[in-house]
């Protein structure tokens, strides 16, 4: 009886010690993970009066003209929100990433849609070798025609997509900011694909963005289709997100 009791006590003590060890290990891991997190947030604004966006005549494609009858579409070269935030600005890390972070490809597969005779989104950013889908949500054919720089790592392609056909997969082989995209059937359709290495984002209607990066020293670059690129250096400390705001001058 005593032998069984002794065995029970020893086993219980060992399990208790193991439990405390696992708890300590877990807490240590959580603390390390929390300390290793960082990030860069910011807002991009336009100083001055934004240029007038021209209305788009879609009368040659009745389906699209009807779809936008109550809310006519304009160009999207400079879109400013109610608080001055600049939409459709690509933000990325141009310096400071180590080789592992720069080569990491997100598992997410974004979609470049053709809807209402517009490219949705107007501007998309993605990583080198990150796959994306091209879809057609309209009841008529479209033609997607990206125009990367000649003799660069990316190759021009031109593909029609009839209504009801499934999305097709594409990928870009090298960095390029940014690749213009047009539709040969509907000449008013324009957009951009920015291809980078590492974390990237496109600003929302408030001009806001977030880049998830580990602690370190970085150069953050913003690119806008009308106003071009701006850069600034930031330092991200462990557990303390950094801020990188940009302001473009209207012209």
Regions found by a protein language model. Give the residues of each.
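Domain-scale selection of a single, long terminal region
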Residues: 2, 19-27
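Generic alpha-helix initiation/capping and coil-helix boundary signal
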Residues: 4-5, 18, 35
């Amino acid at each position: 009886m005593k032998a069984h009791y002794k065995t029970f006590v020893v086993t219980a003590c060992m399990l208790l010690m193991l439990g405390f060890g696992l708890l300590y290990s877990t807490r240590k891991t959580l603390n390390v993970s929390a300390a290793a997190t960082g990030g860069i947030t910011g807002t991009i604004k336009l100083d001055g009066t934004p240029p007038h966006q021209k209305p788009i005549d879609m009368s040659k494609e009745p389906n699209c003209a009807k779809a936008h009858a109550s809310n006519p579409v304009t160009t999207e070269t400079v879109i400013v929100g109610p608080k001055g935030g600049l939409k459709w600005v690509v933000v990325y890390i141009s310096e400071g990433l180590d080789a592992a972070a720069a080569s990491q490809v997100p598992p997410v597969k974004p979609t470049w849609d053709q809807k209402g005779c517009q490219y949705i989104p107007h501007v998309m950013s993605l990583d080198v070798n990150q796959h994306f889908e091209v879809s057609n949500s309209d009841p008529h054919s479209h033609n997607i025609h990206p125009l990367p720089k000649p003799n660069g790592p990316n190759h021009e392609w031109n593909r029609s997509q009839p209504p009801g056909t499934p999305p097709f997969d594409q990928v870009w082989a090298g960095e390029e900011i940014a690749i213009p995209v047009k539709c040969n059937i509907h000449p008013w359709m324009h957009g951009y694909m920015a291809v980078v290495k590492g974390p990237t984002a496109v600003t929302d209607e408030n001009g806001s963005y977030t880049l998830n990066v580990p602690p370190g020293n970085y150069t953050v670059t913003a690119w806008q289709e009308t106003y071009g690129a701006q850069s600034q250096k930031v330092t991200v400390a462990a557990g303390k997100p950094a801020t990188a705001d940009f302001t473009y001058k209207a012209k």
